[in-house]
């Protein structure tokens, strides 16, 4: 069977991304044909910081159109506008290759959002960039593993803004797009307010969620969406036995239980996009950068997910 070609953006080089690339290359090469979007000298420098623990020569790396950031023992673990600009250009190039069908999919290493901001990148993160690049598609952030997947109706927005986003029409569009992308037959939807609103006692948002669920099920012709469920008990073991697929109105309500249960193995997937993209479900981990402590399970699971897609 022909291996899938996967473009791998480098993420913020001051974090654990390059350690993950170097320590996982042999396993990744069994699963796919990786193409690393980074200057090869930066990989060599990363290996030196890791006491030359890994083999660099076999890696297929292509230089990107960006100045090399400062990168040495005094810069690692620190926010840098240079590194932010470099990580963005690596990601942008990966998307370009996927658009041009030169690769089958892309896998992204973690970036530092503050570094992007300091580099004056006008996007909060990977998903925000994809939403702007592919405006005609409703890009959905889904995180998880086969035991539990959570789709986020809102992602990197202030919690105070989520209430205004919960509108029946927008939520119906989201629910139907999520079901189409996952092909899940049962999806549990978390409520927004305590006790899922207690029939309107604690706010009107959950009444809107209920109406969106009813309209979505009617459109599908079967009872796919269940809820809104009180979020404080939605992820109880007996609930997770019903289905691994959930929808959360806000970022932390869905991701707190996911990361408590499956932090090391979860991945981040961009659904409903014209290109296939997956990522690690963790950040740059500046505090352990270049200490040979990075856990590569999430990265390998992201590669496995991409390599198994049609």
UniProtKB/Swiss-Prot annotation:
Main location: cytoplasm
Name of the top EC class for this enzyme: oxidoreductase
Statement: the UniProt record of this protein carries the keyword NAD: yes
Residues reported in the UniProt entry to bind a divalent metal cation: 156, 195, 251
An example molecular function term from Gene Ontology annotations: cobalt ion binding
Keywords annotated in UniProt: Cobalt, Cytoplasm, Magnesium, Metal-binding, NAD, NADP, Oxidoreductase, Pyridoxine biosynthesis, Zinc
Protein's UniProt keywords contain Iron-sulfur: no
EC number in record: 1.1.1.262
Pathway as given in its UniProt record: Cofactor biosynthesis; pyridoxine 5'-phosphate biosynthesis; pyridoxine 5'-phosphate from D-erythrose 4-phosphate: step 4/5
Names of required cofactors: Zn(2+); Mg(2+); Co(2+)
Catalytic activity, reaction form: 4-(phosphooxy)-L-threonine + NAD(+) = 3-amino-2-oxopropyl phosphate + CO2 + NADH
Membrane-spanning intervals of the chain: none
GO cellular component: cytoplasm
Subcellular location per the Swiss-Prot or TrEMBL entry: Cytoplasm
HAMAP family: PdxA_Epsilonprot (MF_02086)
Protein name, as recorded: 4-hydroxythreonine-4-phosphate dehydrogenase
Source organism of this protein record: Helicobacter acinonychis (strain Sheeba)
């Amino acid at each position: 069977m022909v291996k899938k070609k996967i473009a791998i953006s480098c993420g913020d080089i001051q974090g654990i991304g390059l350690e993950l690339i170097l320590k996982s290359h042999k396993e990744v090469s069994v699963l796919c044909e990786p193409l690393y979007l980074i200057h090869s000298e930066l990989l060599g420098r990363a290996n030196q910081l890791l006491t030359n623990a890994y083999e660099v020569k076999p890696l297929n790396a292509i230089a990107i159109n960006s100045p090399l950031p400062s990168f040495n023992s005094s810069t690692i673990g620190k926010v840098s506008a240079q590194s932010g600009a470099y990580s963005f250009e690596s990601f942008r190039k990966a998307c370009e290759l996927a658009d041009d069908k030169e690769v089958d999919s892309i896998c992204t290493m973690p970036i530092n959002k503050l570094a992007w901001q300091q580099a004056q990148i006008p996007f909060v993160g990977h998903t925000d960039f994809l939403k702007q690049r592919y405006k005609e598609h409703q890009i959905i952030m889904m995180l998880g593993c086969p035991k539990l997947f959570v789709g986020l109706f809102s992602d990197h927005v202030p919690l105070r803004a989520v209430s205004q986003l919960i509108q029946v029409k927008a939520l119906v569009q989201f629910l139907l797009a999520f079901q189409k992308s996952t092909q899940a037959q049962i999806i549990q939807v978390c409520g927004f307010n305590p006790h899922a609103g207690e029939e309107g006692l604690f706010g009107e948002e959950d009444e809107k969620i209920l109406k969106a669920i009813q309209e979505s099920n009617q459109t599908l012709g079967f009872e796919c969406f269940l809820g809104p469920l009180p979020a404080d008990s939605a992820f109880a073991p007996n609930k997770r036995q019903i289905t691994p697929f959930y929808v959360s109105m806000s970022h932390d309500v869905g991701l707190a239980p996911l990361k408590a249960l499956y932090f090391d193995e979860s991945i981040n997937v961009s659904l409903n996009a014209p290109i296939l993209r997956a990522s690690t479900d963790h950040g740059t981990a500046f505090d352990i950068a270049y200490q040979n402590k990075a856990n590569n399970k999430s990265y390998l699971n992201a590669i496995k997910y991409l390599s198994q897609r049609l």
